[in-house]
């Protein structure tokens, strides 16, 4: 599983650390919202169906994990909550919907990434 956080919440946490954090201290920025990739895929399909027309036969394709894949990515973000009084403000599913809409309306951003760059990142041929 992975810990998911909406980008605006993350930015607000960074600003809080810059303004109120103690120099030399570290602050883990987390949401305490751990979901696995399958849960994310199912949520995205549900969001997509509510916004755009997609076929009834949407299927999730399972692929082999990459070498060295970690089973869980999670943070202990108690310190930023306790010391800086910061926590996420956007509910996870709302943040995921906002992210989906951003990509839907800003496709020039990701369409500029070449197939070559994707292959290089994934280490596939």
Report each predicted region and the residues it spans.
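C-terminal substrate-binding subdomain of Rossmann-fold SDR/epimerase-dehydratase oxidoreductases
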Residues: 1-125
